[in-house]
Amino acid sequence: MIFTLLSTLPVLIITTELDYSELVHSAELVSSSSYIHHKTNKKPDNCTRDTDIIDRLLNGTGYNKFRIPQEEGMTVVVEIWIQAITSIDELTNDFDMDIYITETWLDPALNFQTMTPCKGNLSLNHQVLDRLWTPNSCFINSKVAQIHNSPFRSVFLMLFPNGTVMVNYRVRVKGPCSLDLSNFPLDLQKCSLIYESFNYNRQEVEMRWSDAEHPVFNLSKIMLPDFDLFEIQTERRQEPYPAGMWDELHVTIIFERRFIWYFMQAYLPTYLTIFISWISFSLGSRAIPARTMLGVNSLLAIVFSFGNIMRNLPRVSYIKGIDVWMLVSMTFIFCSLLELAIVGFMVRDETVAKKKQQKKISGNISREESPHGIISERRFMFPPGCSESSKSLSSCTSGWTPERIDSISSVMFPFSFFVFNIIYWFYYIHRKEIIKQNLINRVDG
């Protein structure tokens, strides 16, 4: 991969007509493309070979890599190419990615225009770079950052005749993420890196992003299981330290969570579980054991689903979007069990009252002998609309029967859940759009 990238570097510089005199404004540079256009198959007479140039620059001129090349200060131009973002870990709040970092600066002590070079530029490795002055830049907020060594140290150095130095590193970096799960799973997450010179303040080394339209860009499409890449933001800040002011180059990568997986794993099973719990309203007031088993199993299913989702998320002290969904869903199932308890209580009360009524009725039956010898019975009178075989006196007088409660519940529960869905989805989708708009306005500003 590194050979493919390095082979494309001259093409990138030619096609974009990159002018280092614009990138590094601290000194007047000659466009490096003029050197790359130079045909190496037509070498000038008595040209100087690469090894001789390096030997003269580093050994014959008293080059000192510990001294800043320009007393008035250096300007280092930075560009980052993202090769891959491999993972985002929400439990540890970090992300991993492979990147190429390109740094460009002007070192007048490395000017070899007068040496009649055989090539328009010199392509060198990290061994030569170790002998040159460098800005000692690093990611100051990274958890881990290391240059790839597969199979050799992945450092590319290009030296131009006018003293322009371009260094490219292939780095694996683990950076921090500031996770806000309040809108989870309809959320956006930000991960950031801060790049600066570790040893030099801005009076000695000025760090700035490339003038390219996108100083940080992707070499290929980023594919992650849970996230899509939404936006890459770059910013240059000046931060005070006890030793002076430092230039910091901030890059913020914003990810948008893929919602479909959570809908399939959390929301869809919850819908089905709640719909199943409503079946108990149609089983009748006498099927208490079956309705109890159905309600309890529904509650256990939704609790298990909730625990399975929360196991992969960090513990936070605020309420997440999915917490609201699961808690309200469990409340609906719990309320269906409360409705079942009320119906069961009324059925039991009805049964006890029926037995008492039957005893009372049997005691109130009087037998009277008629003139024709026929025995007639006088029974206890019930209120109008009630029968002694099906209703207790309390349910008759109040109008609330188990059947009526089930009938009302079969309408009110779906209606209430429908209203909750409208409020829930409108709020969290609207909130997500507000977050997006704020991020876009920040980029435009």
UniProtKB/Swiss-Prot annotation:
Residues 27-258, 308-326, 429-445 are extracellular. Acetylcholine-gated chloride channel subunit. Currents in channels are triggered in response to acetylcholine. Channel properties may be modulated by the formation of homomeric and heteromeric channels. Its main location: membrane. Homopentamer (in vitro). May interact with either acc-3 or acc-4; the interactions do not result in significant heteropentameric ion channel activity. Residues 1-26 form the signal peptide. GO terms for cellular component: chloride channel complex; plasma membrane. One of its GO terms (molecular function) is chloride channel activity. This is Acetylcholine-gated chloride channel subunit acc-2. PANTHER family: NEUROTRANSMITTER GATED ION CHANNEL. Residues 280-286, 348-407 are cytoplasmic. The chain crosses the membrane at residues 259-279, 287-307, 327-347, 408-428. The keyword Transmembrane applies. InterPro entries: GABAA/Glycine_rcpt, Neur_chan_lig-bd, Neur_chan_lig-bd_sf, Neur_channel, Neuro-gated_channel_TM_sf, Neuro_actylchol_rec, Neurotrans-gated_channel_TM, Neurotransmitter_ion_chnl_CS. Glycans are attached at residues 46, 59, 121, 162, 218. It comes from Caenorhabditis elegans. It is found in: Cell membrane. One of its GO terms (biological process) is chloride transmembrane transport. Belongs to the ligand-gated ion channel (TC 1.A.9) family. It is a multi-pass membrane protein. Disruption phenotype: Grossly normal movement. The keyword Cell cycle does not apply.
